[in-house]
Amino acid sequence: MAEFSGYESHLSRQAAAFLIGRSRRQQCHVLDLADQIALHPFQISDYQTDDDDGHKVDNLLLGEFLFTYWVDHAVKEVRITEITKV
C-alpha cells in the first residue's frame, strides 16, 4: 500500500516555469520529488531563509534540485515557491 500523508504539493508560477523548460522525463522526476516533500511535511529542511515578504521558507536539497517551500498545515499543502537545479 502506498504511503499517504494527506498533504499535497502545489507549485508557484515561478516553480512551474522552471519545469516548462525541462524534458518530460525530468519534469516527472521533479514532480515526484515535490510529492516526496508533501509525503513528509514535518521533515526538517536543510536551512531556512526569508522570502520577499519576510516569511520563513524552508530549503531542501533533493538530488540535484533545491526546493524552496513552506507548509500550510491548516489546509495540508506544501507550497513550493522555487525550484533550482544546482
Place the predicted regions along the sequence by residue.
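Basic, Lys/Arg-enriched alpha-helical interface segments
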Residues: M1-L66, W70-V86
